[in-house]
């Protein structure tokens, strides 16, 4: 029976999505979003949003509207750079801005221990450890942007101005 097959697939997919929403990293993001503005919702995608291109394809939006959350290691701590999906973070600009000689990309283990998220699902909010945030001004081209919500299949949509307010990030030119 076609109805039973469709219904069975729906229940399987819905169950998978519900399981994902209950994962601790996503729940941390949900809590922060709800405390900030309860109209902000985490969405679970059927396909991966691990890369900006994947996310844009899944959401049918421009790659530039995707927020890449990139953790950098500095001489003394970590800093999270939020960059438009169609841009590349300039380590030289970040070094100059921070007046530091040594700034590099954090490795997967550092990302996990600092933020509590795995690469591909790093949210701009709800990190395990307090992290300074820089937001590239190129994201301001978009009224609304999409950011990871703790897992490669989860995202949330947020107004650019709200992203600045929520993260308390400093808007800078870092691409």
What residue ranges belong to the model's regions?
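Acidic, Ala/Val/Gly-enriched low-complexity intrinsically disordered segments
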Residues: 2-4, 11
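Extended, low-hydrophobicity, polar/charged segments
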Residues: 9-175
């Amino acid at each position: 029976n076609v109805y039973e097959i469709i219904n069975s697939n729906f229940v399987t997919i819905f169950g998978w999505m519900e399981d994902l929403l209950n994962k601790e990293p996503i729940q941390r993001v949900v809590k922060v979003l709800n405390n900030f503005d309860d109209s902000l919702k985490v969405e679970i995608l059927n396909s991966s949003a691990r890369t900006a291109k994947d996310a844009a394809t899944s959401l049918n939006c421009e790659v530039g509207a995707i927020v890449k959350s990139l953790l950098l290691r500095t001489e003394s701590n970590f800093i999270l750079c939020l960059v438009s999906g169609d841009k590349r973070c300039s380590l030289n600009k970040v070094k100059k801005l921070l007046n530091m000689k040594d700034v590099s990309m954090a490795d997967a283990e550092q990302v996990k221990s600092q933020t509590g998220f795995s690469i591909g699902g790093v949210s701009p909010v709800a990190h395990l450890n307090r992290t300074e945030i820089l937001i590239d001004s190129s994201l301001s081209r978009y009224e609304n942007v999409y950011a990871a919500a703790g897992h490669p299949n989860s995202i949330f949509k947020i107004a650019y101005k709200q992203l600045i307010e929520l993260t308390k990030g400093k808007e800078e030119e870092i691409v």
